[in-house]
UniProtKB/Swiss-Prot annotation:
Protein name: Protein MRH1
Comment field (misc): Present with 182000 molecules/cell in log phase SD medium.
Species assigned in the record: Saccharomyces cerevisiae (strain ATCC 204508 / S288c) (Baker's yeast)
Source organism, top-level taxon: Eukaryota
Region of interest (Disordered), ranges: 285-320
Gene: MRH1
Repeat in keyword set: no
Modified residues (Phosphoserine): 289, 299
Membrane-topology annotation of the record: Multi-pass membrane protein
Length: 320
């Protein structure tokens, strides 16, 4: 057997062998891990492209690129962890829909990737920030939307890790938080974007409509039949989650970067001042030196006094 054939046989995805899913009855296989590696490559590719393009821009024009780079790299780390079959815990399923011949208990233990929710916590606020920036949303309202988005992620993380039916309480609270953010954006931000050009308003409506559909319809459905209801196998669940994650936290943030740059920061109402580097490199204006204080001319004063004294003496002599 040639060396090349040996390397080919040794190659491949061995994440499941190196990091076995000990303690989980329902877990991903090498196919699920392969899909996670595919998602990882997508996030990494788009993140690197945006980073390369960012350094071709002036310092003050890079902020929109940062809003697209951040979610891509955060989810890149999350999917690297899941593809390596790490960042998960076994949780006993509440419903006995998925079964295997090797499980010892009914229902069995399902593999729950908490690393996915950590990725959401870091990446999900960025599409919301981008949409708010298109509308010129005030900072305090933007901060409110981000905080409620993080609240949604924490609630669903707890819901995925809870065995009892109380998981649906956290699920409902988290879904309510997503609805609150959607209402906030469609009232405050939409009222602001109506005052802008039709192109910006149309972009806002198209992209946020997609975000709302994925957040309020697709994600709840996915959670209900995967981590919540134990209907789909973890491989199928990974594909379902992966498609939604790619659209929401990879494709949308990446597409919004060139669109926002096309509109321009001034048109969107953002003006970034000169950077510290430019301020240091700029030549300093010459400082006018203060004029010296006028010194009294003592010689002139003495001459004036001598003249006055001579005149007074002459006047006295004439009087005599």
């Amino acid at each position: 057997m040639s060396t090349f054939e040996t390397l080919i046989k040794r190659g491949g995805n061995e994440a499941i062998k190196i990091n076995p899913p000990t303690g989980a009855d329902f877990h991903i296989t090498s196919r699920g891990s392969d899909w996670f590696w595919t998602c990882f490559c997508c996030y990494l590719l788009f993140g690197l492209i945006l980073t390369f393009l960012m350094f071709r821009k002036p310092v003050n024009d890079r902020f929109f690129y940062l809003t697209g780079i951040a979610p891509n790299f955060f989810m890149c780390i999350a999917y690297f962890t899941m593809a390596s079959n790490l960042g998960w815990i076994p949780v006993k399923a509440k419903y006995n829909h998925v079964q295997t011949s090797t499980q010892k208990e009914h229902p069995g233990y399902r593999q729950i990737f908490y690393s996915r929710f950590v990725g959401w916590f870091l990446a999900l606020p960025w599409p919301i920030i981008q949409i708010c920036m298109l509308a010129g949303t005030p900072f305090w309202q933007m901060a409110f939307n981000v905080c409620i988005t993080e609240f949604f992620t924490v609630c669903w993380l707890i819901a995925a890790c809870v065995h009892s039916t109380y998981k649906w309480g956290y699920y409902t609270i988290g879904l309510g938080a997503a609805i609150v953010v959607s209402i906030s954006v469609m009232t405050t931000s939409y009222n602001l974007v109506k005052q802008r050009d039709n192109d910006i308003r149309l972009t806002f409506l198209v992209f946020f409509s997609i975000i709302m559909f994925l957040w309020i319809i697709a994600y709840p459905t996915c959670f209900g039949i995967t981590d919540g209801g134990n209907v789909l196998q973890p491989d199928s669940a990974g594909i379902f989650y992966g498609i939604i994650d790619l659209i929401l936290m990879c494709f949308i943030p990446t597409l919004l970067v060139p669109i926002a740059n096309h509109f321009g920061a001034d048109k969107l109402g953002y003006h970034f001042g000169p950077s510290d580097a430019e301020a240091v490199m700029a030549p300093k204006a010459p400082v006018a030196s203060p004029r010296p204080a006028a010194t009294p001319n003592l010689s002139k004063d003495k001459k004036k006094k001598s003249k006055k004294s001579k005149k007074s003496k002459k006047s006295k002599k004439s009087e005599e």
